[in-house]
Amino acid sequence: DTSEFDPLANKEYTEEQKQTEEQEQKEFLSHTTTPALEADDGFIVTSASFAQSTPSMSALSGNISPDSQTSDPITKAVRETIIQPQKDNLIEQILKDLAALTDRDLAEQKRKEIEEEKEKDKTLSTFFGNPANREFIDKALENPELKKKLESIEIAGYKNVHNTFSAASGYPGGFKPVQWENHVSASDLRATVVKNDAGDELCTLNETTVKTKPFTLAKQDGTQVQISSYREIDFPIKLDKADGSMHLSMVALKADGTKPSKDKAVYFTAHYEEGPNGKPQLKEISSPKPLKFAGTGDDAIAYIEHGGEIYTLAVTRGKYKEMMKEVELNQGQSVDLSQAEDIIIGQGQSKEQPLITPQQTTSSSVEPPQYKQQVPPITPTNQPLQPETSQMLQSQQVNPNLLNTATALSGSMQDLLNYVNAGLTKEIDSNKQIDLIKEAATAILNNEKSDIAEKQANIIALAENTVNNKNLKPDAKVAGVNAVLETIKNDQNTPNLEKSKMLEATVAIILNSENLEPNQKQQMLEKAVDVGLSLKDDASRAVTIDGIKDVVIKTNLLSNTEKQKLLGSVLKKGVEAQVLSPAQQQLMQQHLDKITAEQIKKDTIKKVNDILFDPLSNTELKTTNIQAITSNVLDGPATAEVKGEIIQEITNTVAGSSLEAQDKAAIIKGVGETIATHSDTSLSLPNKALIMASAEKGIAESQTNLPDRELMTKGLVDGIYEGKGGPEITKAVSSGIDNSNINDSEKEALKKAKDAASEAALDRDTQNLTEGFKGQNIEEHKPHDDIYNKAREVINAVNPVIEALEKSKEPVVSAEERIVHETSSILNNISKLAVEKVNNFRAMLSPNGNLKTLAEKKEESIKKVDELVKAFGTKSSTEEQQSFIKTNLIDDKTLSKEVRLQTIDKLLQEQKRAEAIENPSVKTEDVRVVSGKSKLKPISKDNPDIEKAKMVVGRDRVNIKGNIKIMGALMNARDIIQSENLNKSTPIKRE
């Protein structure tokens, strides 16, 4: 038997088929292909003709694990047939280069490193991810034969994958051409609905064909290619419509926007694997490398050089960054977009007129910037991206006959850069260096042979060359770039709007450079703003400021604090120059506020993490510290929405920490209590509810397991009840669950946990209320004798006089007349006071006095108590009732203590009884049970009138909270009144 089994294709190969396959591989390697056939939009994938200009897709089951080990056959096939063979060939070339390396110790060290790692991991992920090995990888990639092999492996590999897993080959849900439908309103917009193999919609895919003013891209050999048309596809980031997986494999288009031949097709592939909730998650991206972008803006299109040709990919710079961030998130890895930025930084403009130069990335210290070979991928893009230094072909020796910049520019821009760099190297006087740069800028703008696009491209190249030149000191770099900007300002031939584009692109070069300090970037940016504000017309000035603002916001090489400073400077200058409309000022201020909020959020989460991971603090201390942070956020100047976002990050961080579940729940409880108890004057009730919903959303969307999330949700509710939060706050927890990006079963589980916590809290409140009444005889009457009280008043009044008299017995040295006078005065005072008190006492005992019998006093007290209780009943709100208690029962001393205490006892009785229990009609109409549902269910069919309810307290279960507050106020008032005893009396001293 001469057949072989191919595990990838899951079928047997005869010897004849094997030879045919090998022959096809040889054809790819030698580039002796069959006549090129162009695929059309209606083409169906077959084994004989696989490449199509339209995207291909499949809806499959399977997932990919965080450790990059996947069970999905398509993702696995891409790795095994494309990525791993490319790695193997690359390592083989690296080993050859090491064998020829002069430094034998280094060569042996790297050889051992490769061999040892290969025994553990054949993918050599660590080796390829180590920046220290970049020079060996780059050198290997310069080999033309290796480049040819890598490109061939990619083309043949995609053919194998697409054929093996195509629907036409019988693979369930396999690759098939997209059936685009044109939008009626515009022929350049197309869409298609992507469904899984069960027929459920996964997403709607949109394609836009962009027909732009031609712009140029430089190939590795220095030749330029014009781009006039490309397409953008809105790759989905998150999918939540249906379960399943999806692979979108989008063919790269030629420079003119047309379809490639079948034997040269390469693809940008997005792998969406089934996640824990069943929905597709973006787990991996496969694309040729190095991937470059036609500009610095998020709308810049991606392109590659493959087989000596330029191809555009259907992804923009902004979409690529967004996808990479989602890939890292779904792989459980940290996101460091600054690394991705090293690959994709470029210079240029917006879609209206991109400016693309050969230098598409930020170089570190090259002199001059040099082109770099562009090759296919060697690692999947979900692995850490390594910085790539953009290079040009090695410059030739500077021609000694090039006497000035204008002469140099007559050859090429590269000749001009060579001339400038030679002069910067030779000249050590910084002033002369700056003059040379200014001379070069003038030559570029005065070159009559160049159109405006070429002038723009050359000015940007000169600015980048200045920023990255290692022979310039930092201050000289600032002065050099400022000289370029000043030259742009003074040029009389360049239209203002074109100057605006030059300024914006130059600022992008400045801010995205790793060779400048923040203060140097600040100086250059302010100069660019000044030049922009000097333009002749308002429109150009406004466009310049707005464009520079966008560059500041989009750069990834600045911290939020640095962005705040730069954006604030731009805003200030724009306002002072009165070139920004109120709407533009407001928009820029909104961006500034957003950056500020992001910085606050970042700083806050850092503090939270420091607390969570502090080994010396226990849970109680962690809770206290995080409560303090929460309170600071709530007191801050940010909007309620921003505060909610920050609180959501806090709860999400706590939930995702490695602490025990009960410890996390305790901390979350503290956060809930802090929000609930926060001052209503500084944070309105609706805003509290909004923030509480965000707090729960942070818990619900955390990556921790469901039981832990349920426990933390209960903790949040407990915190609300501890903080005496109202119904709106508790209800907000449910809102946070509803708005969370989790599946329905998880939402239901969290809502049950929330309801259970509410019921338990209500039970505790009821039990505490019952305990508060134990041992109290509310009906007990405690009369006091008025006569005794009046007598005591006389004693208290006379006592100070007696004390003064006793003091007068002390030895004196005054004259006899003075002693007699003072003694007489004291005796007169005693006599008057005694007569007054005795007369009052007699008046009380007289028939016309106000001394009543006990029966009369009791009747009068009952009447007064009833009046007070009735007046209390007219107060509808808890606040009014609390005010009544203080004013009429505590502060009003004209009422007897007995009347006030009886009133309190009666009010407590009414609160305890809760009249609704005695009124069945009220019970069935108004009462709500703990779960929050409005209808009560009978306990049994035999007793339909006995309804299952925890407690009835008026028209809303929330009134239980109000009743508890009133009862507390009444009990407190009772204690205060009872303390009004004889403790202020002073007993009569007796000898």
From Swiss-Prot:
Its main location: cytoplasm. Keywords: Cytoplasm. It comes from the Bacteria. InterPro entries: Rickettsia_antigen_120kDa. Disulfide bonds: none annotated. Pfam families: 120_Rick_ant (PF12574). Residues 1-37, 54-73, 348-384 are annotated as: Disordered. One of its GO terms (cellular component) is cytoplasm. It is found in: Cytoplasm. Residues 12-29 have a biased composition (Basic and acidic residues). Residues 348-373 have a biased composition (Polar residues). The keyword Flavoprotein does not apply. NCBIfam families: Sca4_fam. This is Antigenic heat-stable 120 kDa protein.
